[in-house]
């Protein structure tokens, strides 16, 4: 793993659907060189694949992010994202039917895992039911997260312009994101999250972030960078702005796209029933 390989991986966190041609241009590599490196990262198991993150708000659910000491493993059917951290801590994104439902689920987890170290539960969420077009695009991306617009068009029968417009809208709102599944031990890059009551003041994280969830000043930002040295600089700045910010270094992560697909299928089926 050299610096160029690490830059490839970090760039994929920021844009999991970036084409190899564009990636080669960004890194000043020939198409052949980039293709060789990309395939080697796949063959060596550094890149394990790609997955689709779908914000629960997009399928008419509420979400919260919570962290607990990892005394034991849990696998509830409402956990959509699980992140194992260096600090003997697990971070979970959970979904629910309402704010109160989420609070009940945090209480349920607390009975098994102890009191949470962090709870981020945005109150002013606005879940909604997606359009049929959005559902078709998401289903196609779940099958092939790095599918090009033309491939999605062939799969769904939708015009390429419609697909591109909807993807831009969904990605700009952090509702949908294609992410690489990286073996972080092999990759030797650093993925970290910061939770702060004043995350809005940490604009310096813009250069490394690939996911962001904010409500007013409060929020969570997730970043990827090529080295621990780079990460330490970001974390030092974060502590200077907010001494109480919570920092989590990721060692492994998983995303349950199947939960999103099931919820979207339920929405689709109910719409069909109502139309009869």
PLM feature spans:
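A compositional/biophysical signature of low hydrophobicity enriched in polar/charged and small residues
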Residues: 1-276
């Amino acid at each position: 793993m050299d610096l160029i390989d690490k830059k490839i991986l970090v760039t994929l966190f920021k844009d999991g659907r970036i084409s190899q041609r564009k990636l080669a241009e960004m890194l000043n590599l020939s198409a052949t060189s980039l293709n060789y490196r990309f395939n080697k990262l796949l063959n060596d198991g550094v890149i394990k694949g790609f997955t689709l993150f779908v914000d629960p708000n997009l399928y008419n659910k509420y979400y919260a992010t919570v962290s607990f000491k990892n005394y034991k493993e849990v696998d509830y059917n409402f956990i959509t994202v699980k992140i194992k951290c260096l600090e003997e801590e697990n971070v979970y994104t959970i979904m629910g039917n309402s704010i109160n439902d989420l609070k009940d689920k945090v209480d349920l987890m607390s009975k098994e895992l102890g009191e949470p170290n962090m709870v981020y539960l945005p109150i002013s969420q606005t879940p909604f039911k997606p359009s049929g077009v959005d559902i078709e695009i998401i289903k196609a991306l779940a099958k092939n997260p790095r599918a090009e617009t033309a491939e999605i068009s062939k799969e769904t029968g939708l015009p390429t312009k419609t697909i591109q417009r909807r993807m831009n809208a969904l990605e700009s709102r952090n509702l949908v994101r294609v992410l690489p599944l990286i073996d972080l031990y092999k990759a030797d890059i650093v993925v970290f999250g910061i939770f702060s009551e004043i995350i809005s003041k940490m604009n310096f994280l813009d250069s490394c972030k690939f996911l962001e969830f904010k409500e007013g000043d409060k929020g969570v930002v997730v970043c990827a960078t090529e080295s621990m040295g780079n990460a330490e600089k970001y974390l030092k700045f974060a502590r200077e702005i907010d001494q109480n910010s919570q920092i989590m270094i990721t060692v492994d992560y998983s995303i349950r796209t199947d939960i999103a697909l099931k919820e979207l299928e339920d929405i689709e089926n109910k719409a069909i029933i109502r139309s009869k």
